[in-house]
């Protein structure tokens, strides 16, 4: 019997993030408590998001609105990193970013976790920004997925390319 395998990745669907951003912008424009605060949310490059408002409290509330929209669109909070409010002239701004990919340090932690706590006979190999997990038994692969879902990792994980 051939080996079964799957890949562990940390990717975010940019279109879903864009939809969440547009929904948040619409809510910020229409909500009563944001009237007159000139609160905006927009993309900054490919991975960055910038939120601007007249007060520190309103910019924090805008971040909460955006996080709520991300959750509704099934995007993990581990994938969004919001900075601290920074004064910028008469306004406050928060620069956030969308984190994608598994760093080499995180990949080493995951492979060590699989080796130490996973079923015997499971192999984990680092391939760039993803990790390939293979085994002779599919049940072992499902046990590894359950292990990783239960683990407290610093990044969002998805399982793709199941063979």
Curated annotation (Swiss-Prot):
Any one GO cellular component localisation term in the record: cytosol
InterPro entries reported in the protein's UniProt record: DUF520 (IPR007551), UPF0234-like_C (IPR035571), UPF0234_N (IPR035570), YajQ-like_sf (IPR036183)
A Pfam family that the UniProt record links to this protein: DUF520
Domain of life of the native organism: Bacteria
A GO term for molecular function: nucleotide binding
Keywords assigned: Nucleotide-binding
Function field: Nucleotide-binding protein.
Family note: Belongs to the YajQ family.
Protein name: Nucleotide-binding protein Mflv_5248
């Amino acid at each position: 019997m051939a080996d079964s395998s799957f890949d562990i990745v940390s990717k975010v669907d940019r279109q879903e993030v864009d939809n969440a951003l547009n929904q948040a912008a619409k809510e910020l424009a229409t909500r009563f408590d944001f009237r007159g605060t000139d609160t905006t949310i927009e993309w900054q490059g490919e991975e960055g998001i910038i939120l601007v408002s007249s007060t520190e409290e309103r910019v924090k509330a805008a971040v909460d609105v955006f996080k709520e929209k991300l959750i509704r669109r099934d995007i993990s909070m581990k994938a969004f990193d919001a900075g601290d409010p920074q004064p910028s002239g008469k306004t406050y701004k928060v620069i956030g970013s969308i984190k994608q990919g598994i760093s080499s340090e995180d990949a080493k932690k995951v492979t060590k976790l699989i080796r130490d706590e996973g079923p015997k006979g499971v192999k984990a190999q680092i391939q760039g920004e993803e990790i390939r997990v293979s085994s002779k038994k599919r049940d072992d692969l499902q046990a590894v997925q359950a292990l990783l879902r239960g683990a407290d990792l610093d990044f969002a994980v998805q399982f793709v390319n199941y063979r």
